[in-house]
Amino acid sequence: MEMLLFLNESYIFHRLRMWSTVLWHSCVFVCVECENANYRVPRCLIKPFSVPVTFPFSVKKNIRILDLDPRTEAYCLSPYSVCSKRLPCKKYFYLLNSYNIKRVLGVVYC
């Protein structure tokens, strides 16, 4: 199962809104400025992931990322930005509770 995890830093720290989208057999990189998505199947970074929710989801169904257990999730940052307004971020791994997570452009689980 593949899952996109989109973190917008203004939503995380100011509005506490975070969303995730369930996808199948694909990876998605998302720009936090314009929210444009770019589907890329090859070269996807892999991190372990577990969720305390029922599967399977509908492909287009959205769930709140706050419904997932932050203690068991790790996210890989996209080294690419699909928006021309921002430069690509560096490739690093952070846990959800990391103080550096606010610098993320987009995250992907594949």
UniProtKB/Swiss-Prot annotation:
Taxonomic superkingdom: Eukaryota
Family classification: Belongs to the UPF0377 family.
Protein name, entry field: Putative UPF0377 protein YKL223W
